[in-house]
Amino acid sequence: MGLVSFEDVAVDFTLEEWQDLDAAQRTLYRDVMLETYSSLVFLDPCIAKPKLIFNLERGFGPWSLAEASSRSLPGVHNVSTLSDTSKKIPKTRLRQLRKTNQKTPSEDTIEAELKARQEVSKGTTSRHRRAPVKSLCRKSQRTKNQTSYNDGNLYECKDCEKVFCNNSTLIKHYRRTHNVYKPYECDECSKMYYWKSDLTSHQKTHRQRKRIYECSECGKAFFRKSHLNAHERTHSGEKPYECTECRKAFYYKSDLTRHKKTHLGEKPFKCEECKKAFSRKSKLAIHQKKHTGEKPYECTECKKAFSHQSQLTAHRIAHSSENPYECKECNKSFHWKCQLTAHQKRHTGVTYFQEVVFQQITVSDWTGNLSENGPHRPTWTWAYGIMDFVKAWSRCIIGGGL
Protein backbone atom coordinates (compact mmCIF):
# COMPACT_ATOMS: atom_id res chain seq x y z
CA MET A 1 0.00 0.00 0.00
CA GLY A 2 1.59 3.29 -1.09
CA LEU A 3 1.53 6.23 1.27
CA VAL A 4 0.64 9.77 0.29
CA SER A 5 3.68 12.07 0.30
CA PHE A 6 3.58 15.56 1.73
CA GLU A 7 4.23 17.10 -1.68
CA ASP A 8 1.03 15.46 -2.98
CA VAL A 9 -1.19 17.31 -0.54
CA ALA A 10 0.76 20.52 0.10
CA VAL A 11 -0.66 23.82 -1.18
CA ASP A 12 1.87 26.37 -2.47
CA PHE A 13 1.38 30.14 -2.39
CA THR A 14 3.50 32.78 -4.01
CA LEU A 15 4.52 35.86 -2.05
CA GLU A 16 1.92 38.00 -3.82
CA GLU A 17 -0.84 35.47 -3.20
CA TRP A 18 0.15 35.16 0.46
CA GLN A 19 -0.16 38.92 0.95
CA ASP A 20 -3.75 38.75 -0.27
CA LEU A 21 -4.74 36.41 2.59
CA ASP A 22 -6.21 37.79 5.79
CA ALA A 23 -5.27 36.59 9.29
CA ALA A 24 -7.99 33.92 9.52
CA GLN A 25 -7.09 32.44 6.14
CA ARG A 26 -3.39 32.28 7.04
CA THR A 27 -4.21 30.53 10.31
CA LEU A 28 -6.38 28.02 8.46
CA TYR A 29 -3.57 27.33 6.01
CA ARG A 30 -1.04 26.81 8.80
CA ASP A 31 -3.30 24.44 10.75
CA VAL A 32 -4.12 22.34 7.69
CA MET A 33 -0.48 21.97 6.65
CA LEU A 34 0.77 21.12 10.15
CA GLU A 35 -2.06 18.63 10.71
CA THR A 36 -1.32 16.99 7.37
CA TYR A 37 2.38 16.71 8.16
CA SER A 38 1.71 15.24 11.62
CA SER A 39 -0.52 12.60 10.02
CA LEU A 40 2.23 11.54 7.66
CA VAL A 41 4.85 11.53 10.43
CA PHE A 42 2.67 9.23 12.48
CA LEU A 43 2.81 6.68 9.65
CA ASP A 44 6.50 7.16 8.87
CA PRO A 45 8.58 8.67 11.71
CA CYS A 46 11.66 8.83 9.48
CA ILE A 47 10.09 11.22 7.00
CA ALA A 48 12.17 14.33 6.37
CA LYS A 49 10.69 17.63 7.51
CA PRO A 50 9.96 19.89 4.51
CA LYS A 51 11.13 23.47 4.44
CA LEU A 52 7.51 24.61 4.42
CA ILE A 53 6.90 23.01 7.83
CA PHE A 54 10.02 24.66 9.26
CA ASN A 55 8.71 28.05 8.17
CA LEU A 56 5.17 27.46 9.43
CA GLU A 57 6.36 26.25 12.83
CA ARG A 58 8.36 29.46 13.23
CA GLY A 59 5.42 31.64 12.23
CA PHE A 60 6.58 32.48 8.71
CA GLY A 61 4.86 32.04 5.40
CA PRO A 62 5.63 29.44 2.72
CA TRP A 63 8.63 31.39 1.40
CA SER A 64 12.24 31.70 2.53
CA LEU A 65 13.07 33.12 5.95
CA ALA A 66 15.01 35.99 4.44
CA GLU A 67 11.96 37.15 2.51
CA ALA A 68 9.75 36.65 5.55
CA SER A 69 11.85 38.61 8.04
CA SER A 70 9.34 41.45 8.20
CA ARG A 71 6.17 39.33 8.12
CA SER A 72 4.74 36.73 10.48
CA LEU A 73 1.80 34.50 11.12
CA PRO A 74 -0.92 35.60 13.56
CA GLY A 75 -0.60 34.33 17.08
CA VAL A 76 3.19 34.00 16.91
CA HIS A 77 4.52 37.45 16.01
CA ASN A 78 3.04 40.94 16.03
CA VAL A 79 0.32 41.20 13.41
CA SER A 80 0.27 45.01 13.30
CA THR A 81 2.62 45.00 10.32
CA LEU A 82 0.23 43.00 8.14
CA SER A 83 -1.30 44.71 5.15
CA ASP A 84 -4.80 46.05 5.55
CA THR A 85 -5.72 44.92 2.06
CA SER A 86 -8.57 42.44 1.85
CA LYS A 87 -8.17 41.10 -1.65
CA LYS A 88 -9.76 37.77 -2.38
CA ILE A 89 -7.75 34.61 -2.76
CA PRO A 90 -7.61 33.14 -6.24
CA LYS A 91 -10.37 30.56 -6.58
CA THR A 92 -7.96 27.87 -7.76
CA ARG A 93 -5.94 28.17 -4.53
CA LEU A 94 -9.05 28.06 -2.37
CA ARG A 95 -10.29 24.92 -4.10
CA GLN A 96 -6.87 23.33 -3.70
CA LEU A 97 -6.81 24.17 0.00
CA ARG A 98 -10.31 22.74 0.55
CA LYS A 99 -9.33 19.49 -1.17
CA THR A 100 -6.33 19.02 1.11
CA ASN A 101 -8.35 17.39 3.84
CA GLN A 102 -9.82 14.96 1.31
CA LYS A 103 -6.35 13.89 0.18
CA THR A 104 -5.08 13.52 3.75
CA PRO A 105 -4.94 9.84 4.77
CA SER A 106 -8.13 8.79 6.50
CA GLU A 107 -8.23 7.18 9.95
CA ASP A 108 -9.01 3.77 8.47
CA THR A 109 -6.00 4.01 6.14
CA ILE A 110 -3.75 5.08 8.98
CA GLU A 111 -4.97 2.29 11.25
CA ALA A 112 -4.39 -0.35 8.57
CA GLU A 113 -0.91 0.93 7.79
CA LEU A 114 -0.02 1.24 11.46
CA LYS A 115 -1.17 -2.31 12.17
CA ALA A 116 0.96 -3.65 9.31
CA ARG A 117 4.02 -1.80 10.55
CA GLN A 118 3.60 -2.85 14.15
CA GLU A 119 3.37 -6.53 13.25
CA VAL A 120 6.97 -6.45 12.06
CA SER A 121 8.24 -4.08 14.74
CA LYS A 122 9.79 -5.40 17.94
CA GLY A 123 8.22 -4.64 21.25
CA THR A 124 4.76 -3.89 19.93
CA THR A 125 2.37 -2.91 22.71
CA SER A 126 -1.38 -3.26 22.69
CA ARG A 127 -2.06 0.32 23.55
CA HIS A 128 -0.54 1.54 20.26
CA ARG A 129 -2.37 -0.82 17.92
CA ARG A 130 -5.43 1.31 17.40
CA ALA A 131 -4.32 4.91 17.75
CA PRO A 132 -5.75 7.13 15.01
CA VAL A 133 -4.13 10.44 14.24
CA LYS A 134 -6.94 12.43 15.80
CA SER A 135 -6.31 10.64 19.07
CA LEU A 136 -2.58 11.32 18.91
CA CYS A 137 -2.74 14.97 17.99
CA ARG A 138 -6.07 15.95 19.50
CA LYS A 139 -6.32 19.69 19.71
CA SER A 140 -8.33 20.97 22.64
CA GLN A 141 -9.90 24.36 22.13
CA ARG A 142 -8.73 27.05 24.50
CA THR A 143 -10.99 28.49 27.15
CA LYS A 144 -10.88 31.93 28.69
CA ASN A 145 -8.86 30.72 31.67
CA GLN A 146 -6.25 28.88 29.55
CA THR A 147 -2.97 30.56 28.63
CA SER A 148 -0.31 29.56 26.16
CA TYR A 149 2.93 30.86 24.75
CA ASN A 150 1.71 30.93 21.18
CA ASP A 151 -1.90 32.09 21.72
CA GLY A 152 -3.08 29.18 19.58
CA ASN A 153 -4.56 25.76 20.11
CA LEU A 154 -3.28 23.29 22.69
CA TYR A 155 -2.15 19.87 21.50
CA GLU A 156 -2.85 16.96 23.84
CA CYS A 157 -1.25 13.53 23.77
CA LYS A 158 -3.94 10.86 24.00
CA ASP A 159 -1.63 8.29 25.60
CA CYS A 160 -0.49 10.30 28.63
CA GLU A 161 -2.79 13.36 28.39
CA LYS A 162 0.13 15.79 28.39
CA VAL A 163 -0.66 19.14 26.74
CA PHE A 164 1.77 21.02 24.48
CA CYS A 165 1.74 24.49 23.02
CA ASN A 166 2.60 23.46 19.46
CA ASN A 167 2.32 20.41 17.30
CA SER A 168 6.05 19.92 16.75
CA THR A 169 6.66 19.55 20.48
CA LEU A 170 3.91 16.95 20.66
CA ILE A 171 5.51 14.98 17.82
CA LYS A 172 8.90 15.01 19.58
CA HIS A 173 7.24 13.88 22.79
CA TYR A 174 5.48 11.00 21.04
CA ARG A 175 8.64 9.82 19.32
CA ARG A 176 10.63 9.91 22.54
CA THR A 177 8.02 8.33 24.83
CA HIS A 178 5.35 6.31 23.03
CA ASN A 179 6.76 5.43 19.62
CA VAL A 180 7.32 1.73 18.96
CA TYR A 181 10.11 2.30 16.46
CA LYS A 182 13.34 2.88 18.43
CA PRO A 183 16.44 2.13 16.34
CA TYR A 184 19.13 2.88 18.96
CA GLU A 185 19.75 0.01 21.39
CA CYS A 186 22.05 -0.12 24.40
CA ASP A 187 24.58 -2.96 24.13
CA GLU A 188 24.66 -3.57 27.88
CA CYS A 189 21.00 -3.59 28.95
CA SER A 190 19.22 -3.78 25.54
CA LYS A 191 17.16 -0.68 26.32
CA MET A 192 16.03 1.10 23.14
CA TYR A 193 15.70 4.80 22.31
CA TYR A 194 14.38 6.84 19.42
CA TRP A 195 17.01 9.58 19.67
CA LYS A 196 20.73 8.85 19.57
CA SER A 197 21.34 11.59 22.14
CA ASP A 198 19.15 9.71 24.63
CA LEU A 199 21.21 6.56 24.08
CA THR A 200 24.44 8.49 24.65
CA SER A 201 23.12 9.92 27.93
CA HIS A 202 21.95 6.48 29.02
CA GLN A 203 25.31 4.86 28.29
CA LYS A 204 27.01 7.31 30.66
CA THR A 205 25.09 5.77 33.55
CA HIS A 206 26.68 2.40 32.80
CA ARG A 207 30.16 3.92 32.83
CA GLN A 208 29.49 5.66 36.12
CA ARG A 209 28.29 2.43 37.71
CA LYS A 210 31.51 0.59 36.93
CA ARG A 211 33.63 0.14 40.03
CA ILE A 212 37.07 1.28 38.91
CA TYR A 213 38.78 1.62 42.32
CA GLU A 214 39.93 -1.82 43.46
CA CYS A 215 41.59 -2.78 46.73
CA SER A 216 44.99 -4.41 46.20
CA GLU A 217 44.61 -6.50 49.38
CA CYS A 218 41.24 -8.22 48.94
CA GLY A 219 40.20 -7.22 45.41
CA LYS A 220 37.05 -5.40 46.53
CA ALA A 221 36.07 -2.56 44.18
CA PHE A 222 34.39 0.78 44.87
CA PHE A 223 32.73 3.58 42.93
CA ARG A 224 34.79 6.37 44.50
CA LYS A 225 38.40 6.69 45.55
CA SER A 226 37.39 8.09 48.95
CA HIS A 227 35.49 4.86 49.64
CA LEU A 228 38.58 2.85 48.72
CA ASN A 229 40.77 4.94 51.04
CA ALA A 230 38.34 4.35 53.91
CA HIS A 231 38.26 0.62 53.17
CA GLU A 232 42.06 0.32 53.12
CA ARG A 233 42.15 1.44 56.75
CA THR A 234 40.53 -1.86 57.73
CA HIS A 235 43.62 -3.65 56.39
CA SER A 236 46.20 -1.26 57.86
CA GLY A 237 44.46 -1.01 61.23
CA GLU A 238 44.49 2.80 61.14
CA LYS A 239 41.61 4.40 63.04
CA PRO A 240 41.89 8.17 62.55
CA TYR A 241 38.56 9.07 64.14
CA GLU A 242 38.87 9.04 67.94
CA CYS A 243 36.28 9.84 70.56
CA THR A 244 37.46 12.64 72.87
CA GLU A 245 35.60 11.20 75.86
CA CYS A 246 36.55 7.52 75.93
CA ARG A 247 39.44 7.50 73.42
CA LYS A 248 37.77 4.83 71.35
CA ALA A 249 38.84 5.00 67.70
CA PHE A 250 36.97 4.17 64.49
CA TYR A 251 37.70 3.60 60.85
CA TYR A 252 34.87 5.79 59.58
CA LYS A 253 33.67 9.20 60.66
CA SER A 254 30.05 8.05 60.51
CA ASP A 255 30.82 5.39 63.14
CA LEU A 256 32.32 8.05 65.41
CA THR A 257 29.27 10.27 65.01
CA ARG A 258 27.01 7.36 65.86
CA HIS A 259 29.18 6.47 68.85
CA LYS A 260 29.09 9.99 70.32
CA LYS A 261 25.34 9.71 70.74
CA THR A 262 25.90 6.99 73.34
CA HIS A 263 27.69 9.50 75.58
CA LEU A 264 24.81 11.94 75.35
CA GLY A 265 22.49 9.32 76.76
CA GLU A 266 19.79 9.97 74.17
CA LYS A 267 17.59 6.95 73.59
CA PRO A 268 14.60 8.12 71.55
CA PHE A 269 13.51 4.64 70.42
CA LYS A 270 11.45 2.92 73.12
CA CYS A 271 9.98 -0.57 73.14
CA GLU A 272 6.24 -0.52 73.80
CA GLU A 273 6.34 -3.96 75.43
CA CYS A 274 8.98 -3.49 78.14
CA LYS A 275 9.60 0.29 77.87
CA LYS A 276 13.30 -0.31 77.22
CA ALA A 277 14.88 2.50 75.22
CA PHE A 278 17.57 2.36 72.53
CA SER A 279 19.76 4.87 70.79
CA ARG A 280 19.26 3.30 67.34
CA LYS A 281 16.16 2.19 65.56
CA SER A 282 17.94 -0.93 64.27
CA LYS A 283 18.67 -2.06 67.83
CA LEU A 284 15.02 -1.57 68.75
CA ALA A 285 13.99 -3.74 65.78
CA ILE A 286 16.33 -6.52 66.95
CA HIS A 287 15.04 -6.23 70.50
CA GLN A 288 11.39 -6.42 69.46
CA LYS A 289 11.99 -9.79 67.85
CA LYS A 290 12.74 -11.17 71.30
CA HIS A 291 9.17 -10.40 72.36
CA THR A 292 7.61 -11.90 69.27
CA GLY A 293 9.97 -14.88 69.20
CA GLU A 294 10.53 -14.32 65.49
CA LYS A 295 13.71 -15.88 64.14
CA PRO A 296 13.57 -15.66 60.37
CA TYR A 297 17.28 -16.31 59.75
CA GLU A 298 18.07 -20.03 59.87
CA CYS A 299 21.39 -21.81 59.47
CA THR A 300 21.24 -24.30 56.60
CA GLU A 301 23.68 -26.69 58.31
CA CYS A 302 22.39 -27.03 61.87
CA LYS A 303 18.92 -25.46 61.42
CA LYS A 304 19.56 -23.04 64.25
CA ALA A 305 17.52 -19.87 63.87
CA PHE A 306 18.43 -16.29 64.70
CA SER A 307 16.54 -13.05 64.97
CA HIS A 308 19.04 -10.97 63.02
CA GLN A 309 21.13 -11.42 59.91
CA SER A 310 24.39 -10.43 61.61
CA GLN A 311 23.94 -13.19 64.19
CA LEU A 312 23.54 -15.76 61.44
CA THR A 313 26.62 -14.44 59.63
CA ALA A 314 28.71 -14.75 62.79
CA HIS A 315 27.32 -18.24 63.42
CA ARG A 316 28.23 -19.47 59.94
CA ILE A 317 31.89 -18.70 60.57
CA ALA A 318 31.91 -21.32 63.32
CA HIS A 319 30.80 -24.00 60.83
CA SER A 320 33.33 -23.08 58.20
CA SER A 321 37.04 -23.68 58.46
CA GLU A 322 37.62 -20.10 57.38
CA ASN A 323 39.71 -17.94 59.70
CA PRO A 324 39.49 -14.47 58.19
CA TYR A 325 41.40 -12.65 60.95
CA GLU A 326 45.15 -13.28 60.59
CA CYS A 327 47.97 -12.06 62.79
CA LYS A 328 50.66 -10.28 60.78
CA GLU A 329 53.37 -11.26 63.29
CA CYS A 330 53.00 -15.06 63.31
CA ASN A 331 50.39 -15.59 60.54
CA LYS A 332 48.04 -17.32 62.95
CA SER A 333 44.37 -17.06 62.00
CA PHE A 334 41.26 -16.75 64.11
CA HIS A 335 37.51 -16.99 63.68
CA TRP A 336 36.72 -13.81 65.56
CA LYS A 337 38.30 -10.40 65.58
CA CYS A 338 38.28 -10.24 69.39
CA GLN A 339 40.43 -13.39 69.42
CA LEU A 340 42.95 -11.71 67.14
CA THR A 341 43.02 -8.60 69.33
CA ALA A 342 43.70 -10.63 72.46
CA HIS A 343 46.39 -12.63 70.64
CA GLN A 344 48.21 -9.54 69.35
CA LYS A 345 48.65 -8.26 72.90
CA ARG A 346 50.85 -11.26 73.62
CA HIS A 347 53.34 -10.12 71.01
CA THR A 348 53.67 -6.71 72.67
CA GLY A 349 54.44 -8.28 76.08
CA VAL A 350 51.95 -6.01 77.83
CA THR A 351 49.73 -7.62 80.47
CA TYR A 352 46.16 -6.65 81.09
CA PHE A 353 47.08 -4.81 84.29
CA GLN A 354 49.96 -2.98 82.58
CA GLU A 355 47.54 -1.75 79.94
CA VAL A 356 45.40 -0.15 82.59
CA VAL A 357 48.21 1.46 84.55
CA PHE A 358 49.89 2.72 81.39
CA GLN A 359 49.33 6.28 82.61
CA GLN A 360 50.39 5.32 86.19
CA ILE A 361 46.83 4.76 87.38
CA THR A 362 46.48 2.43 90.34
CA VAL A 363 43.54 0.77 91.99
CA SER A 364 43.74 3.27 94.85
CA ASP A 365 43.44 6.12 92.33
CA TRP A 366 40.35 4.44 90.89
CA THR A 367 38.64 3.96 94.28
CA GLY A 368 39.73 7.38 95.49
CA ASN A 369 38.31 9.11 92.45
CA LEU A 370 35.03 7.29 92.89
CA SER A 371 34.75 8.52 96.47
CA GLU A 372 35.58 12.10 95.52
CA ASN A 373 33.42 12.39 92.41
CA GLY A 374 30.63 10.12 93.54
CA PRO A 375 28.72 8.33 90.79
CA HIS A 376 30.11 10.58 88.07
CA ARG A 377 32.75 9.59 85.53
CA PRO A 378 36.37 10.12 86.73
CA THR A 379 38.05 13.21 85.37
CA TRP A 380 41.20 11.52 84.07
CA THR A 381 41.37 9.26 81.03
CA TRP A 382 42.92 5.90 80.19
CA ALA A 383 44.62 4.61 77.11
CA TYR A 384 42.05 1.86 76.62
CA GLY A 385 38.88 3.31 78.19
CA ILE A 386 36.93 2.59 81.36
CA MET A 387 35.43 -0.69 80.17
CA ASP A 388 38.89 -2.07 79.43
CA PHE A 389 39.98 -1.01 82.92
CA VAL A 390 37.14 -2.93 84.57
CA LYS A 391 37.76 -6.00 82.44
CA ALA A 392 41.51 -5.95 83.12
CA TRP A 393 40.99 -5.42 86.86
CA SER A 394 38.71 -8.44 87.09
CA ARG A 395 41.15 -10.59 85.14
CA CYS A 396 44.05 -9.53 87.35
CA ILE A 397 42.07 -10.43 90.47
CA ILE A 398 41.16 -13.84 89.06
CA GLY A 399 44.75 -14.47 87.98
CA GLY A 400 46.21 -13.31 91.28
CA GLY A 401 47.73 -10.16 89.86
CA LEU A 402 46.81 -7.99 92.86
Curated annotation (Swiss-Prot):
Keyword Membrane: no
Region: Disordered, residue numbers: 118-139
Limits of the KRAB domain: 4-75
Cross-referenced CDD domains: KRAB_A-box (cd07765)
A GO term for molecular function: zinc ion binding
GO cellular component: nucleoplasm; nucleus
Compartments, record wording: Nucleus
UniProt keyword terms in alphabetical order: Metal-binding, Nucleus, Repeat, Repressor, Transcription, Transcription regulation, Zinc, Zinc-finger
Pfam families: KRAB, zf-C2H2
Biased composition (Basic residues): 125-139
SUPFAM superfamilies to which the protein is assigned, alphabetical: beta-beta-alpha zinc fingers, KRAB domain (Kruppel-associated box)
Family of this protein: Belongs to the krueppel C2H2-type zinc-finger protein family.
Protein's recorded name: Zinc finger protein 809
Organism, as annotated: Mus musculus
Gene, per the UniProt record: Zfp809
